[in-house]
Amino acid sequence: MDLLTLEGWLDNTAFAVLFLTMLLYWCGAAFPQWPLLTAAGRTGMAIANLCITGLLAARWIEGGYFPISNLYESLFFLCWGLTAMHFVAESISGQPLVGVVTAPVAMGITAFAALSLPPEMQQSAPLVPALKSNWLMMHVSVMMLSYATLMVGSLLAIALLVVTWGQPVNLKGSSVGTGSFRSRRPEPSLEASTGNGGTTVLTPPALQLSLQRLTLAETLDNLSYRMIGLGFPLLTIGIISGAVWANEAWGAPWSWDPKETWALIVWLVYAAYLHARMTRDWQGRKPAILATVGFGVVWVCYLGVNLLGKGLHSYGWFF
């Protein structure tokens, strides 16, 4: 089997495995009494990560350079980072809901790369002169890992918003998300006769968050903060290394290129998130909304800017 055939087999296998993994995690969340579903989903995520690792290794051997120079390669590297950070988040929390939100995004990325990109975009090509640098691996890989980590943190924040949707719940505690307790606004109650001259107070179930969901909300809030706290330094290192590389390649560390501008916007959004958590003691829904905004901004920075087809970072242009 030649490398091209192996690559085609691995990218399609990664997509199929991630699709099944997504279904397993969703079924595991719907039927928590069947823990084997979640265990199978975890195994599927590991298999997908190994398939992508093999794909990237084959591309590296074929091209002779770190495989992150075009859109196809960067999408699979992003998916590799996403599946790797999935295991980091799941090992920290032991919460299977992590896979419920990460598996569909990873599956969507592989589907776009393997099934939507034209064949010429999937082929390995010689590096353009500007990319023939040792900074390629340092800058681009760190940036992609930061995107993957921030995406996982933001996806967990989105899950928190879904879990607490329509509920006036506040999480209060330390800035690092530990030692928190729950508080809810007063909820309307109803009085009903007991039949023996007394009354009992009833609280409408629809207006309550169960203890299990409150605990889940706390876990998601804490885990989202930890993952974003991990991704933000990676993003900072990636931006700084890019500035150093740009200064060597083009004579200026910053040129307000569209990709550079949006990377700065991403940095500012997550800096605001961390600032609010550390100095304003934000927890729960408010920082989750900010992280959700960050999720969209990351995608604009990574993929949306490529739609312009302009600037020094337009190597991923595909129209």
UniProtKB/Swiss-Prot annotation:
Subcellular location: Cellular thylakoid membrane
Superkingdom of origin organism: Bacteria
Keywords per UniProt: Cytochrome c-type biogenesis, Membrane, Thylakoid, Transmembrane, Transmembrane helix
Official protein name in the record: Cytochrome c biogenesis protein CcsA
Annotated InterPro entries: Cyt_c_assembly (IPR002541), Cyt_c_biogenesis_CcsA (IPR017562), Cyt_c_biogenesis_CcsA/CcmC (IPR045062)
Gene Ontology MF terms: heme binding
Role, per record: Required during biogenesis of c-type cytochromes (cytochrome c6 and cytochrome f) at the step of heme attachment.
GO terms under biological process: cytochrome complex assembly
Membrane topology category: Multi-pass membrane protein
Designated gene of the protein: ccsA
PANTHER family membership: CYTOCHROME B_B6 PROTEIN-RELATED (PTHR30071:SF1), HEME EXPORTER PROTEIN C (PTHR30071)
Predominant location: membrane
Any one GO cellular component localisation term in the record: plasma membrane-derived thylakoid membrane
Annotated stretches, region: Disordered: 175-201
Oligomer status and interactors: May interact with ccs1.
Native organism: Thermosynechococcus vestitus (strain NIES-2133 / IAM M-273 / BP-1)
Comp. bias intervals (Polar residues): 191-201
TM segment ranges: 14-34, 46-66, 74-94, 97-117, 142-162, 227-247, 254-274, 288-308
Family: Belongs to the CcmF/CycK/Ccl1/NrfE/CcsA family.
